[in-house]
Amino acid sequence: MGVIINESKSVKWEGKVEIADNFIKRAFGFMLRNPGHALIFILPFETRFNATIHGFFMLKSIDVIFLDSEKTVVDVTTLRPWRIYVPKKAAKYVIEGPVGLRKVLKVEVGDKVEWIT
């Protein structure tokens, strides 16, 4: 179990939190898996290109939160299967989770987000 915290609004989401900190975990993400937990991608560089995500082979839509190196939200979206999304600004961290994650966290651009695994 883990927790994702919107420190700007003092709200949290509790559930399984997995860190995708290597190429294989980042490459597969939620492909062919049910997004019932949160997956946090730690990217090697803070760029828009590295933070681009896709929904290829995904079974369901997911909520996605993009954070810069200071863990400040720079973009938020809901990604549908078979779509590609490029964040509006460079990101160092990407949080993927079930649809509703962004609503529970009340997350908006500019919020500070932290997690505990």
Swiss-Prot record:
InterPro entries: DUF192 (IPR003795), Saro_0823-like_sf (IPR038695), UPF0127 (IPR022906)
Database matches in Pfam families: DUF192
Superkingdom: Archaea
Protein family (similarity comment): Belongs to the UPF0127 family.
Protein's recorded name: UPF0127 protein PYRAB11210
